[in-house]
A protein has these predicted regions:
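Conserved HGGG/HGGXW glycine-rich cap/lid loop of the alpha/beta-hydrolase fold
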Residues: 8-72
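Conserved hydrolase catalytic core segment
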Residues: 93-137
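Flexible "cap/lid" loop of the alpha/beta hydrolase fold
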Residues: 121-160
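Active-site loop/oxyanion-hole signature of alpha/beta-hydrolase fold enzymes
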Residues: 59-102, 276
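Acidic catalytic loop of the alpha/beta-hydrolase fold
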Residues: 235-239
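Alpha/beta-hydrolase
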Residues: 150-219, 226
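Catalytic active-site module of serine/aspartate enzymes centered on a nucleophile-bearing elbow/loop
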Residues: 254-284
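Short beta-strand/loop motif that positions the catalytic acidic residue
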Residues: 224, 230-232
Length: 284
């Protein structure tokens, strides 16, 4: 990974919002997922720094970005407000925007509300909602992994009561993490160890858990005017092909790419495919 700069600025309400800058070329703003997880999980974004100047946001309350005073201020509109402040800070009339997972939901909200500010949009392993069809696909993907040696503990973690402390949340998140991969072995476990000790923001996860049952962006997606790439892993257990198909159908002119042998962590599972598809789209 190349050297990167950790930069930041003060938001209108006095918080510090930080981002990591690396690479050279046209600016690509990336909003990571989680929520509440360290953006370190994205690594160098599949080497896209070789083609673009990456601006990888530390969303509010994660990484080096301040937590808001209100522990409930982690709604999608809060994140999109921060994204707009970042655009203004960068001095860009329009941005190329990549949203990953939860960050992809933020990117949808932003691009639908401010279509004139988005030049190109990449929606990676994300969804417009988690309705019955998406939930059925998730359950089928979970059952498909039932023969794996890690399955029993990972599945049990998802059935437990909501943890109270950030450390307890970290334990639950990482126990369940194998589901995010098409195949989970020593290499994937080693990757998790590279950011396992990063702080987790439980407030952000709790707000998301409360907000996601009513999430449904389908009526807004026609407002998106930017050329859009929807990309996910074939084996993604939470935002897989069912989610991608719905997004692609709802966003005018959107292009869909399904990456084989990849799950929710497609950016680290199949970095070459992810890099090539995203770079080709952004430079076409």
């Amino acid at each position: 990974m190349p050297d990167s700069e950790l930069k930041g600025f003060a938001t209108a309400d006095g918080r510090k919002l930080s981002y990591r800058k690396l690479g050279t070329g046209p600016v690509l703003v990336c909003h990571p997922g989680g929520p509440g997880l360290s953006p370190a999980y994205l690594g160098d974004l599949a080497g896209l720094w070789t083609r673009f100047t990456l601006i990888i946001l530390n969303p509010r309350g994660t990484g080096a970005s301040d937590r808001p005073a209100d522990p409930h201020a982690y709604h999608f509109d809060d994140y999109t407000s921060d994204l707009e402040e970042l655009r203004q800070h960068l001095g860009l009339e329009q941005i190329m925007l990549l949203g990953y997972s939860h960050g992809g939901v933020v990117a949808q909200v932003y691009a639908a509300a401010r279509p004139e500010r988005v030049r190109r949009l990449v929606l990676a392993v994300t969804t417009a909602r988690l309705g019955p069809e998406q939930q059925a696909a998730t359950q089928a993907a979970i059952e498909k992994r039932s023969g794996q040696p890690w399955f029993e503990d990972a599945n049990a973690a998802g059935q437990e009561e909501d943890p109270e402390t950030d450390d307890q949340i970290r334990d639950q998140v990482f126990r369940r993490m194998p589901f995010n991969f098409a195949r989970f072995g020593p290499a994937e476990a080693a990757y998790l160890d590279t950011w396992r000790s990063e702080p987790i923001n439980g407030d952000a996860l709790r707000v998301f858990s409360e907000e996601v049952p009513s999430l449904d962006l389908r009526s807004r997606l026609a407002n998106i005017t930017a050329p859009t790439l929807v990309i996910t892993g074939l084996e993604d257990y939470v935002c897989g092909p069912v989610c991608a198909a719905e997004l692609t159908a709802a966003i005018p002119g959107a292009r869909e790419v399904i990456v084989a042998d990849a799950g929710h962590m497609v950016v680290v599972e199949q970095p070459l495919s992810f890099h090539d598809e995203v770079a080709a789209f952004l430079t076409s």
